[in-house]
Amino acid sequence: MKRGGRDSDRNSSEEGTAEKSKKLRTTNEHSQTCDWGNLLQDIILQVFKYLPLLDRAHASQVCRNWNQVFHMPDLWRCFEFELNQPATSYLKATHPELIKQIIKRHSNHLQYVSFKVDSSKESAEAACDILSQLVNCSLKTLGLISTARPSFMDLPKSHFISALTVVFVNSKSLSSLKIDDTPVDDPSLKVLVANNSDTLKLLKMSSCPHVSPAGILCVADQCHGLRELALNYHLLSDELLLALSSEKHVRLEHLRIDVVSENPGQTHFHTIQKSSWDAFIRHSPKVNLVMYFFLYEEEFDPFFRYEIPATHLYFGRSVSKDVLGRVGMTCPRLVELVVCANGLRPLDEELIRIAERCKNLSAIGLGECEVSCSAFVEFVKMCGGRLSQLSIMEEVLIPDQKYSLEQIHWEVSKHLGRVWFPDMMPTW
């Protein structure tokens, strides 16, 4: 009996020990699976890439391992500085302490940088202050964006140029530069070309009054890899188009031209020779030529007098029937047409002519214009299903003997191959 009792006690003891070992093993396994701090840094890095900066900063406080990942160079290649003054903007600004940390610890990691500034001069000055400190980084892209009026233009030109030149000198592989509405000038463009001519592919510099045609020509002559360019019409010249058409230059993919007049009758618009356009389109047959017009009616005389390779036309002010008629005759490559206003004379003949001659037209928008319902249906019928975007206010369409406003939506839908309704003006 005693021996049997001892065996029973031994078995009970062994079972208890096994149970404790099992619980301990389970606890250890559970603690290992739940120890987020031991995750591989590569895994944490991939997760951090999908988090907004603020969430990433909070997560970096979990443990030392996560904090190390937070400061890895891969997370600081791309950054957007938002510089706003509380009195002039409702948008959140990048915290000053974060800016200090970026300059101190990550300036040499930055490659893709943009600055968004509000309308205040202080924000533009802050952007220049940051730019002037980027002496240890080689940027690949830089964008200076004014979210309201162009506040960079309020700065002394020398102050802005000094800050921008720091980036041009230290960046040896700049491929994209967006500096619309800034006081950049010809000498600073020469610095850009001297240091980045082999890598520059995109340059946006609309509304840069201190740049001359010679300044932009210098860029075109040296930056043979340039594929996208945006500038004002006063910088466009026959020499520039020929430089962009040289054998050394790659084929241009996108050329945007802003044709702007602030005061009627005070701006002279020169004429580009047809031979220059012909050479340009032979060299870059697939280029998108985008033109924005903000002119008064009497200033359109130099334009649309012969065939040009425009693909996208936007008229921001009232444009006459005569000009739109010339568009139909001179823009066979037209893909998109937007007319904000025309007046009270119906555009029936002009639309029909555009449909006949512009075989690639796929998008059209009409604002304060007038078109008879019959002419509009005929226009849609001629263009057919290729009209992927058709934005017409209901007030534009004038009922006639053939179609009422109720009937037109069915007829247009039939020719488009999809349901279509005219746009409605909000009641508020």
Swiss-Prot record:
Molecular function per GO: ubiquitin-protein transferase activity
UniProt-recorded name of the protein: F-box/LRR-repeat protein 3
Consequence of substituting C358A: Loss of binding with CRY1
Residue windows of the LRR repeats: 119-146, 181-207, 208-233, 234-259, 316-341, 343-368, 369-394
Subunit comment: Part of the SCF (SKP1-CUL1-F-box) E3 ubiquitin-protein ligase complex SCF(FBXL3) composed of CUL1, SKP1, RBX1 and FBXL3. Interacts with CRY1 and CRY2 (phosphorylated). Interacts with HDAC3. Interacts with KDM8.
Gene Ontology CC terms, in alphabetical order: cytosol; nuclear body; nucleus; SCF ubiquitin ligase complex; ubiquitin ligase complex
Gene: FBXL3
Protein's job: Substrate-recognition component of the SCF(FBXL3) E3 ubiquitin ligase complex involved in circadian rhythm function. Plays a key role in the maintenance of both the speed and the robustness of the circadian clock oscillation. The SCF(FBXL3) complex mainly acts in the nucleus and mediates ubiquitination and subsequent degradation of CRY1 and CRY2. Activity of the SCF(FBXL3) complex is counteracted by the SCF(FBXL21) complex.
Principal location listed in the UniProt entry: nucleus
